[in-house]
Amino acid sequence: MSQPDVEVLVKPECHLCEEALKVTADACSEFGLQHRTTDISTDPALAQQFAEEIPVLRINGAVRDFWRFDPQRLRRLLREASGN
């Protein structure tokens, strides 16, 4: 199975974004996965869509979490997306 596309949507000066990125990086490293970060302030459509929900976790394009990411839930989501 191919590696899931794990993306965290963030914006500048967002303390929840910093926390979410750490939780995501830690969980992804446990599974040997990569994640990417997208700054919504550089994309007006994303900024309009997600302005009130940042940070947002998307796995394979689907929104799976927002605001505070629960590490246990994230691990479960990554396990499911990885087919493990």
Language-model features: locations:
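Conserved helix-turn-beta segment immediately C-terminal to the redox Cys motif
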Residues: 21-38
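A short, hydrophobic beta-strand/beta-hairpin element that forms part of a small beta-sheet core
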Residues: 55-63
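Non-catalytic, surface beta->alpha helical segment in thiol-disulfide oxidoreductase systems
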Residues: 62-84
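Short, well-ordered coil/turn elements that cap or connect secondary structure elements
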Residues: 1, 30-32, 51
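Generic recognition of short, well-ordered alpha-helical segments
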Residues: 19-22, 49-52, 69
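Local sequence-structure signature of Cys/Sec-based thiol-disulfide redox active-site neighborhoods
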Residues: 2-26
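Thioredoxin-like thiol-disulfide oxidoreductase module
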Residues: 36-53
